[in-house]
Structures are given as C-alpha cells and as structure tokens.
Amino acid sequence: MRASLIQIGVKDDETVEFRRQRVASLVVEAGREGSDLVVLPELWTTGAFAYESFAAEAEPLHGPTYEVMAKAASDAGVWLHAGSVPERTPSDGGSATGDGPLYNTSLLFSPSGELAATYRKIHRFGFDKGEAVLMAAGAELVTVRLPETTLGLATCYDLRFPELFRGLVDAGAETLVIPAGWPERRQSHWTLLARARAVENQAYVLACGTAGTHARVPQAGRSIVVDPWGEVLAEAGTDEEVLTVEFDPARVGTTREQFPALKDRMLGLDAPRR
C-alpha cells in the first residue's frame, strides 16, 4: 500500500480558498503518482493555533472544504483523509445559521469522492484556553475498513492518551492515522509518542503535521510513518513536503502473531489497595 502525507505549510498571508485549491492539486498529484491513501494535517485551513480564526472560518460539514476535498479524492482516485476543519453545527433548534457548537472534525473520503467517515476530536488542547474552550469534545471512536487495512482515526492531542488508541485497536484498527498541528517546542514528544502508539498497539502509525509558522507558533513538521515494530519507515523535515511511503498492511497480523503481546493484557484487575 502506498501512502502520501502532505505536510502543509500554513501561511498567515495565504487565503483559505487559495490554500484549499493548492492542497487539492497536491492530492491529485499524489494520486497520479500511485498513492492509495493521502493524509492531510489538522486544521490546515486555519492553523491549529489560530484560535481567533476558528469561529470566523468554521464551516458546516458539507461546506467549502468538504466540496473541494471530495472532488480532489475523486479526481485522484485515492482514499483521502482530509485532515480536520473547524466544523460549525446547527443549534439545538435546528437553526440554518449553524450557531451550534464547534468541533474539530476530520473528514475521510473514498476514491469516488464519497464521505466515508467523520471523526470529532475527543481530546481538545489548551487546558483552560484555546481549543479546549472554543470547541466541543467528540464522543465516538471511529474505525474505517479499507480494502487493504482498517484505519483508526485520531487527531493531534489525542496522541497523548493511549487508552483511545487501545480502544481503536479493540475495534479492529490496524493503521492509526493522526493529523496534527504539533508545535516545534514539543517535537521530541511527537516522535516519541508516535512510536509508542505503534509499538504498544502493534499497528502502523501515519502522523501528518503542519510546517512553517502561523499565529506566531513555529510548527514541528516531522510527519512520520512508523511500522508495528516501532521502526520509522519515513520522516519529513520541517518545511512543506509530501512524504510518500510504501508499507505492507499484512505486517500488522504477522507482528501480532509472532509477538502476541496484546493477548497478554490483564484488564479488569482490581486496583492495588493503598
């Protein structure tokens, strides 16, 4: 299976619509070069730290980014994880103005351009500010069966919560896809956690970040693909880049069979008394 991670440079002086079209052309190019799966970063239309832009640039699920990315997936003939967008939802009263809560929502399209899945980010970053107060939390784990593998979907800060990934694996995930907007100052955590999630779940990890600087926050870049044994198959630099790698989905089953650590889990034990 061939995957391309498009590490987008989010530039403050670039309009959102121009960026959509620019990214769509990169998706189509990846498809022409033989990729089966293309992955984009988190919140690439706004920038993950451009908090003041979330409300202004939020869009309904079937909004402009949906339309452009659906066409790109179809034109490219690829499975497209289109990263995430700030999704504006209808109010409880069903208002057409979409004044309900915002979500950090990932979109996955099939090679025909149909929406195959959405995932609303569960763990929001910011503690008592930023995304944590501007967006609502998702509540559902999402896996998607592709012909070659089963994807488990997560987003950025989710990477720090191993129980989410164990839940995805229990639901059948073999390839963990993680779009992100990870800052440069915590780049070492990014690499370490991506490899840890691969090792402990005996799964592939495809983690796609953003490049450059936006909202005065330098981005880590360093998109990475890790195999089920924790070996790094490919890693990007810090600039905008298309990281393409070939990987064998059957390696997940082989690894789990030859080193069946997941079968030795001892869940359900009582916590030790203090």
Name each model-derived stretch.
Residues 61-81, 159-243:
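CN hydrolase (nitrilase-like) catalytic-core segments centered on the catalytic cysteine
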